[in-house]
Amino acid sequence: MTTAPSEDLLTLARWMAGDFSNQKQALAQPQTFAHIRVFFRPLPFAFFGTVGFYSEQTYDYDLWSPYRQGLHRLLDREGGIYIENYGLQDAGLYAGAGHDPEILATIPTDCLQPRRGCAMVFRREGDCFRGSVEPGNHCLIPRDGYWTYLVSEVELTESTWVSLDRGMDRETHRQIWGSQAGPLHFEKREGFDPPLPPLGKGG
């Protein structure tokens, strides 16, 4: 029998589901921060058999050319809520799915490309969730001739998403890429209804 998602997982999903923008930050510091949009669009519950999302990150001036796309599966585990991260085969076919539900509906389950070692672990802390990459420094990303591991820190509230991603050299642990000016501060422009388990599941 399938275990129903926890209340914390459903709350995390509800807060994640939306269209986020760092417009205020970009206007206040235009030489430092570009105006970025982040979409977390809920997937049908049947896609993963649990709560899941499609995401894309794109510059506000070109919503049809995301520079980051992913699929995300939310799971209750000991120690927190795990968000497994996946790439998409032929991701360009689904560009724009963050703001176009018709494109979202075309994403097949067989396009998943697991990102090993790249799960995010979230824990509830009062009126927010804090997340970071699973331990081990195994989320590897090639960049500028180096193999780097991802260090990602996220704080999520009902209306905000604050994130800082950095790539660290595997050997020296010095920063190779990512923001030098601090985290990106996003505010939710629009919320989306999160995916819910079908009636009769759980127990």
Swiss-Prot record:
CDD domains for this protein: CpcT (cd16338)
Protein encoded by which gene: cpcT3
Keyword Lyase included in the entry's annotation: yes
HAMAP family per UniProt: Chrphore_lyase_CpxT
Annotated InterPro entries: CpcT/CpeT (IPR010404), CpcT/CpeT_sf (IPR038672)
UniProt keyword annotation of GTP-binding present: no
Molecular function in Gene Ontology: lyase activity
Keywords, comma-separated and alphabetical: Lyase
Task performed by this protein: Covalently attaches a chromophore to Cys residue(s) of phycobiliproteins.
Family classification: Belongs to the CpcT/CpeT biliprotein lyase family.
One Pfam family recorded for the sequence: CpeT
Protein name: Chromophore lyase CpcT/CpeT 3
Highest taxon above the source species: Bacteria
UniProt-listed Enzyme Commission number(s): 4.-.-.-
